[in-house]
Amino acid sequence: MRSFLSKLPQRPWPTSIDQMRNLQISCSQFREDLLLTHLLGYKKTNAFYVDVGCFKPIQFSNTFIFYQRGWSGIAIDANPAFEPLWKKVRPRDKFINSGVSTEAGKLEYLQFHNYPASNQLRIPGEQSQFHLELPPDRVTLIDTKPLSTILKAMVPANKKIDFMSIDCEGLDEVVLKSNDFALHRPSVLLIEDHARSFSSPVHQFCEQNGYRLHSLCALTKIFVDGAIWDVICCEKQLE
């Protein structure tokens, strides 16, 4: 609380009614939710998202403002401490406490008490792009499964996924590869890519699966399904 209060004087506050009207609230770490709103519009109130590596229900959330507009979806995180928070703050969402990997099994889960947003799986043969100088405070063995398995069990039949947010601390390509895009194909993909390069494995995977890069928001790349690019990126601009 003391840290929060000390930062208040540094934040810009609206000083008039006009400024209040133009105020835009964002909960995302890099304001991805504002870009998403630009893409998907304000009018949808009953749409669906998937949030992989969801963290807390409000802080750094790419999905919270959509929840406030009436959306709902599936939130997946390996940290069991987040489950009661999600059930209390976002009861319409289904929280799944699980790690995500290409094959079902058990993997080591690294936890950093002072940096919970940096918790990550240790996957054999995969190198996280996110490195911490400090060793993990706790290492536990947790159940993991492919994203395709989770979505097949939790997404209603014929339910369209309007967007999917993936933030798994450098292991995002693993999450992508574990999904069945023929069965569950989000219209928009938000994915953290520390490499940033257009030739990164994450970028290449998305393009090879028919997605086109729409925008880069700090570490997050926003891809749109190429099959509906004109509908989302062109017709939306005319609304």
Can you say where each PLM-predicted feature lies in the sequence?
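Phosphate/nucleotide-binding beta-alpha loop and adjacent structural elements of enzyme active sites
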Residues: 1-239
